[in-house]
């Protein structure tokens, strides 16, 4: 699978790359303390469109909001800030809001499924997870999970808004408000919003990794009768966690030991393909076979 090389113009390591909803622009986050927006086209061309400055430390992640809420990009940094950027005129970006709730590096951000509102989850080295939700008056409400992973939160990922099995059941279902998180305590945890506060929704925490969890990704379920979370760790393993009905125990299965740290795991939109990027500069794509085993279907050339 040959790739297209894109010159970002960053002057230091690029930590995150996110494509917008329409696949026309990418946002990149870098140790040079900036975010860059680059236009991309199918014929292989790319064009630098904007540079966003405001962070005072390396920028770890960027996340595009769903376009139904306008052209909004979130970023998080070692400086403890989460910045929301809004595009006014084309490629003219301004800081719309700066969240300074965290006192340490904010390592991960994720927008909730667009059906449940404009909500941003943030995980920090201070051990806390914060969730910022937009109000109709333009302000923001904040809910927190204090000491979610006391030694530091590395990653957050939202559950799909529809409950598992929704396609095969009838009647209206309440949207799902759940988060998965990974931390420096080597665990994956699941959280549920109930009566205005977040509570842990897995007992015990999901413990199969032997080193920091670097990334978690909750799979789109498309109404399938199970929930699936992938986690990648410093220990080199990717684990696929599944649970059937609400209240049952999560089961973890090792997809593979990559023998090098796993940095990112990412699901396809249909939830049947998982991309894994590892410390050897390899990106591999995996699919679950009929017998439940995972097999590699392709590799992306660096």
Curated annotation (Swiss-Prot):
One of its GO terms (cellular component) is Golgi apparatus. One of its GO terms (biological process) is protein transport. WD repeats lie at residues 9-48, 54-95, 101-142, 148-201, 208-251, 257-296. Keywords: Endoplasmic reticulum, ER-Golgi transport, Golgi apparatus, mRNA transport, Nuclear pore complex, Nucleus, Protein transport, Repeat, Translocation, Transport, WD repeat. InterPro entries: G-protein_beta_WD-40_rep (IPR020472), Sec13/Seh1_fam (IPR037363), WD40/YVTN_repeat-like_dom_sf (IPR015943), WD40_repeat_dom_sf (IPR036322), WD40_rpt (IPR001680). The keyword Cytoplasm does not apply. GO terms for molecular function: structural molecule activity. Disulfide bonds: none annotated. Pfam families: WD40. It is found in: Golgi apparatus; Endoplasmic reticulum; Nucleus envelope; Nucleus, Nuclear pore complex. Its main location: Golgi. Part of the nuclear pore complex (NPC). The NPC has an eight-fold symmetrical structure comprising a central transport channel and two rings, the cytoplasmic and nuclear rings, to which eight filaments are attached. The cytoplasmic filaments have loose ends, while the nuclear filaments are joined in a distal ring, forming a nuclear basket. NPCs are highly dynamic in configuration and composition, and can be devided in 3 subcomplexes, the NUP62 subcomplex, the NUP107-160 subcomplex and the NUP93 subcomplex, containing approximately 30 different nucleoporin proteins. Belongs to the WD repeat SEC13 family. Required for protein transport from the endoplasmic reticulum to the Golgi apparatus. This is Protein transport protein SEC13 homolog B. It comes from Arabidopsis thaliana (Mouse-ear cress). The gene is SEC13B.
């Amino acid at each position: 699978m040959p790739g297209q090389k894109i010159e970002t113009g960053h002057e230091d390591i690029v930590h995150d790359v996110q494509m917008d909803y329409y696949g026309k622009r990418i946002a990149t986050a870098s140790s040079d303390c900036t975010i860059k927006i680059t236009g991309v086209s199918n014929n292989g061309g790319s064009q630098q469109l904007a540079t966003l400055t405001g962070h005072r430390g390396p920028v770890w992640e960027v996340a595009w909001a769903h376009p139904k809420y306008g052209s909004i990009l979130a970023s998080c940094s070692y400086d403890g800030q989460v910045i929301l950027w809004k595009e006014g005129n084309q490629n003219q970006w301004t800081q719309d809001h700066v969240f300074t709730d965290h006192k340490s590096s904010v390592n991960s951000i994720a927008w909730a499924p667009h059906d449940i509102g404009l909500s941003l989850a943030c995980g920090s080295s201070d051990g806390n997870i914060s969730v910022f939700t937009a109000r109709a008056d333009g302000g923001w409400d904040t809910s927190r999970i204090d000491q979610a992973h006391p030694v530091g939160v590395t990653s957050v990922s939202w559950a799909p808004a529809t409950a598992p099995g929704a396609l095969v059941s009838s009647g209206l279902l309440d949207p799902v408000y759940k988060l998965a998180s990974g931390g420096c305590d080597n665990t994956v945890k699941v959280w549920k919003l109930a009566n205005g506060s977040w509570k842990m929704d897995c007992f015990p925490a999901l413990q199969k990794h032997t080193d920091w969890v670097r990334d978690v990704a909750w799979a789109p379920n498309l109404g399938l009768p199970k929930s699936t979370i992938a986690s990648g760790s410093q220990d080199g393993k990717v684990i696929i966690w599944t649970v059937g009905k609400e209240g049952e125990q999560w089961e973890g299965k090792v997809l593979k030991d990559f023998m090098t740290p796993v940095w990112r795991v990412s699901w396809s939109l249909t939830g049947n393909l998982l991309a894994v990027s590892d410390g050897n500069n390899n990106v591999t794509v995996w699919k679950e076979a009929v017998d439940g085993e995972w097999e590699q279907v392709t590799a992306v050339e660096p």
